[in-house]
Amino acid sequence: MPRLDVRGVSVRFGGNVALDDASLSADAGCVTGLIGPNGAGKTTLFNVVTGLLPPTSGAVAIDGSDITGLNPHKRARRGLARTFQRLELFTMLTVRENILVAADIHRKWSRDKEDPAERTDAIIGRIGLRATADVRVTALPTGQGRLVELGRALACKPTVLLLDEPASGQDDGETEQFARLLRELAEEGVAVVLVEHDVRLVMAVCDVISVLDFGRVIAMGTPAEIQSDEAVLTAYLGASKGSE
């Protein structure tokens, strides 16, 4: 049974189809990639999974339990966390405070006995931001801001982690660090779903990849299978390689 199971999800805005019978599954202990051209529906799918957008049809389940009708905070209690394509940090707070807010909220609604301050400190070390822990996030470069947002998601101890273009703005060193962290999270049993335009990162870190085009899943397979799929080459990878 997949940790996350999205089945036949469609989203329509009037006559516009954002998702068309899209399905996606993510297993515990795996990094699942979700790629496709701009406007393919990747963020829309994340919004459906997290409860920010109701589907026109279809269903979402975690560990076999249907969560389609649950609001976002109840989905979070089921172990779901995400980052956003645009940074959504508390701009008046420091790195430490941003993560501590999430850790404290998690303890309150989960009855977790771990001290939020201790968890926050451990996460700061894990994402490599000890030197800037007490700096306001507005002073950080974008790549480090992405790490703060990841740290805030980790404060909620997710079993399903959705990452929307988390490597955007990162330099090569930060991307390498990020890739190692994703693999560590998978090895700890987290189901990671990665939306990312950095094709090299996706191919290096993902166990399986799904490809969206015009709201439909056109391919699913291992990185090697995706790289040789004619439909994917036509719709996405060929264009991506040509733009590098």
Mark where each language-model region is.
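Glycine-rich phosphate-binding loops of nucleotide-dependent enzymes
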Residues: 2-244
